[in-house]
Swiss-Prot record:
Residues 87-126 are annotated as: Right arm (Gly-rich tandem repeats). Residues 18-86 are annotated as: Central domain. Residues 1-17 are annotated as: Left arm. This protein is one of many from the eggshell of the silk moth. The lineage of its organism: Eukaryota, Metazoa, Ecdysozoa, Arthropoda, Hexapoda. InterPro entries: Chorion. It holds the Pfam family Chorion_1. GO terms for cellular component: egg chorion. This is Chorion class B protein M1768. One of its GO terms (molecular function) is structural constituent of egg chorion. Keywords: Repeat. Belongs to the chorion protein family. Transmembrane segments: none annotated.
Amino acid sequence: YGGLGYGGLGGGCGRGFSGGGLPVATASAAPTGLGIASENRYEGTVGVSGNLPFLGTADVAGEFPTAGIGEIDYGCGNGAVGITREGGFGYGAGYGDGYGLGFGGYGGGYGLGYGGYGGCGCSWGY
């Protein structure tokens, strides 16, 4: 049993390491960057540009007059939402020089393997 798997094959480390999807659930806080509250009438457009942390919301509270119309026309960009910048180093230490948990699960005889081979079991154990 090389590594933590059977016959040199690793035991698997979850969906994040196998190329499958990694589901994430989030909940946004209430928007605090732009607020318009008044009993008056607003006409025209409000333009906001820049990087916003959330997509945003629109809310109408109160009563509309019985005569006339009331509406909200709300849009946010072109629909292309993505991460523009991430923090962190971007590179991790993974090369063990053959004396531990090295690159690609290769332990070089001194890892967690069996018979001079092995590794952590997350990759091929030879």
